[in-house]
Amino acid sequence: MTAQNSKFRSVGIRAPRGTQLTAKSWLTEAPLRMLMNNLDPEVAENSYELVVYGGIGRAARNWECYDKIIETLKELEDDETLLIQSGKPVGVFKTHSNAPRVLIANSNLVPHWATWEHFNELDAKGLAMYGQMTAGSWIYIGSQGIVQGTYETFVEAGRQHYNGNLQGRWVLTAGLGGMGGAQPLAATLAGACSLNIECQQSRIDFRLRTGYVDEQAKDLDDALTRIEKYTQEGKAISIALCGNAAEILPELVRRGVRPDLVTDQTSAHDPLNGYLPKNWSWEEYRQRAISAPEEVIKAAKSSMVEHVKAMLIFQQQGIPVFDYGNNIRQMAYEVGVENAFDFPGFVPTYIRPLFCRGIGPFRWVALSGDPQDIYKTDAKVKELLPDDQHLHHWLDMARERISFQGLPARICWVGLGQRAKLGLAFNEMVRSGELSAPIVIGRDHLDSGSVASPNRETESMCDGSDAVSDWPLLNALLNTASGATWVSLHHGGGVGMGFSQHAGMVIVCDGTDEAAERIARVLHNDPATGVMRHADAGYEIAIHCAKEQGLDLPMLNTK
């Protein structure tokens, strides 16, 4: 079986449910179930090719590697650690019971060679795998994983631009993949209508089926008629439109249409695999990506130019426009749009104050498969954080509107101090039997202290340290030392090869005293690195938070 052919398998994968173990302990059962859950057809964008989300973000290098990972996890002891190199299981080593059970490194290249061209050569030879962020680190939970972050972004945009009220307003965006698919629901929850352009009908069908988008328009005229009707009625309805953003946005400009917010979440970070050139069919795009990759990349970037130029015109008209972290500005800049960065990224514009307090995407998954376990943890979050009415509102909306994909899961943005409190409480719920099986807690790599990405999470840092990637390396090392159950270190997630480095962690709450000790360390230290990183850069909010939380930052005399 060749490296390429072993990427394809027509099979449905579903993680085990219940309390029956297939591995030797919950510490190894958890990564096994979460890897399988990443590839559940309810979760993954293209499970047959091991693609979870984000263009070609995969969970394992090929099907042979997947099989061997599962086989190895089933036999792994609680004092051993499995090493994963770009989706391939390469070694098992004796460590100790408080060490991670799995250590993962995905897509990492020496900086000079950190380009899509070199990566694609390696990938074609079966020597590399693009892990995106949570695809190759086995903690993807479907579009819910980004819904609250997108919701928080839209809410903050409404606060800054429309006096905190998006009723009667509408968002223009594109991309309904694993990440972009969160946009329509997030806009609805924030009170706005949205027009969501997507070039693949299958993705629109997926979002309609899972309740992330409300309706599909038959063409642009129909979409605009619906937008006008719903905004006049003050209804927050999301509309999908099958088409190409590089064609539709310029047409909207020509017609003089004025959205209230404009952004984009196409997979522009990967022009070879993630952005359809205008006037091409998807089938033609995929065929020519194999036969004429340089031609495809050129055509995709040329279309991105049209897309970005339209976004710039909207901005010049006074409409709030922002990059949602897919590196489309960079792609357009590289082929001649010198002012591509005139519109800002979402992190410095709307999210950074949260990062300064270690607040970010805290997520957990019920390994039992029982939705009641999630509903019980929702109630526990409200009990332990009684004064955070914004968070309570989010949890209520999530329960009402968000469909679980695969194993039941929840996301909520909480910060330093809160994460450890919640994790320890969940562990006690497992110990007491209130929850029917262990919980895993993880996060997106998009977090306060775990990523260096100058065109996204670390854009426009106040001290100019945007590209310093020591921070995610330190985050991964500290989470390993603290006893996370698995730790990952990736390159290129979100924005593509050469533009980011980032780390992830997952910890198991199995109800034991040993788990409680690990949880206390990991869920304090992990967000604390974000406060440290921002305090070191000079953000006063972060410095104050560090002092308030008793962090020992020697150069800042915080203790």
From Swiss-Prot:
Name the keywords, alphabetized. Cytoplasm, Histidine metabolism, Lyase, NAD
Which Pfam families did the record assign? Urocanase (PF01175), Urocanase_C (PF17392), Urocanase_N (PF17391)
Name a biological process GO annotation: L-histidine catabolic process to glutamate and formate
Give, as in the UniProt entry, the pathway in which the protein acts: Amino-acid degradation; L-histidine degradation into L-glutamate; N-formimidoyl-L-glutamate from L-histidine: step 2/3
Q: Which InterPro entries match?
A: Urocanase, Urocanase-like, Urocanase_C, Urocanase_central_sf, Urocanase_CS, Urocanase_N, Urocanase_Rossmann-like, Urocanase_sf
Q: Where in the cell is it found?
A: Cytoplasm
Q: Which GO terms describe its molecular function?
A: urocanate hydratase activity
Task: Give the residues the record marks as binding NAD(+).
Answer: 54-55, 132, 178-180, 198, 203, 244-245, 265-269, 275-276, 324, 494
- List the catalytic residues: C412
Q: Paste the cofactor note.
A: Binds 1 NAD(+) per subunit.
Q: Which cofactor does it need?
A: NAD(+)
Quote the HAMAP family the UniProt record gives.
HutU
Q: What does this protein do?
A: Catalyzes the conversion of urocanate to 4-imidazolone-5-propionate.
Q: Which family does it belong to?
A: Belongs to the urocanase family.
Question: What is the name of this protein?
Answer: Urocanate hydratase
Q: Which organism is it from?
A: Photorhabdus laumondii subsp. laumondii (strain DSM 15139 / CIP 105565 / TT01)
